[in-house]
Amino acid sequence: MKQLLQDSWWNQLKEEFEKPYYQELREMLKREYAEQTIYPDSRDIFNALHYTSYDDVKVVILGQDPYHGPGQAQGLSFSVKPGVKQPPSLKNIFLELQQDIGCSIPNHGSLVSWAKQGVLLLNTVLTVRRGQANSHKGKGWERLTDRIIDVLSERERPVIFILWGRHAQMKKERIDTSKHFIIESTHPSPFSARNGFFGSRPFSRANAYLEKMGEAPIDWCIKDL
């Protein structure tokens, strides 16, 4: 485990990895990866924590579970590997980004450049069976990702939580709003984007909070590959 995580996350979470629920989750994953097609690749499960250290987190964008189509998931919420078609929700995120800040829409869907700047792209469930959304829901991941939200909420340095849709907004109760900022709207899915996501300007609002705190803003524009 330790080699998959930044030291700062290991220090925050190492006790969690010793708990019985996590040991059970690990055993379940060993079976699932041996017998089923599971996404993302096992080496990519903790990419959100790998790319964005605990100390560097400025913004959190919460997702649900990984994309369940071949080659899509890369361990970062909403992000897909380069060369993979942009899923509908991600297309809508890029449309809002264009309207909000004026960024051109990139020719790929990888959000690694955000992660490297301090945007924690965290799904609440970190694995999924091919073609079966929510197939690893309720298996233990939520306890771990709740703990990740908790340790960020306990931090003195403010974090901006971007919560899109009801599933993400259920985590609001874990966030200390006397220290941290919440930006919320409907989900960018085609089913709900026109009911409040479009026009919500999450990217410029996040940068306004960062500048108010004396932090460098995020360069949300993603370069073509």
Curated annotation (Swiss-Prot):
A biological process from GO: base-excision repair, AP site formation via deaminated base removal
UniProt-listed InterPro entries: UDG_fam1, Ura-DNA_Glyclase_AS, Uracil-DNA_glycosylase-like, Uracil-DNA_glycosylase-like_sf
GO CC annotation terms, alphabetical: cytoplasm
Domain of life: Bacteria
Cytoplasm recorded as keyword: yes
Localization in the cell: Cytoplasm
Family of the protein in this entry: Belongs to the uracil-DNA glycosylase (UDG) superfamily. UNG family.
HAMAP family: UDG (MF_00148)
NCBIfam families from the UniProt entry: PRK05254.1-1 (NF003588), PRK05254.1-2 (NF003589), PRK05254.1-4 (NF003591), PRK05254.1-5 (NF003592), ung (TIGR00628)
Task of the protein: Excises uracil residues from the DNA which can arise as a result of misincorporation of dUMP residues by DNA polymerase or due to deamination of cytosine.
Subunit description: Interacts with bacillus phage phi29 protein p56; this interaction inhibits the uracil-DNA glycosylase. Interacts with SSB (ssbA).
Protein name: Uracil-DNA glycosylase
Species this protein is from: Bacillus subtilis (strain 168)
Gene of this entry: ung
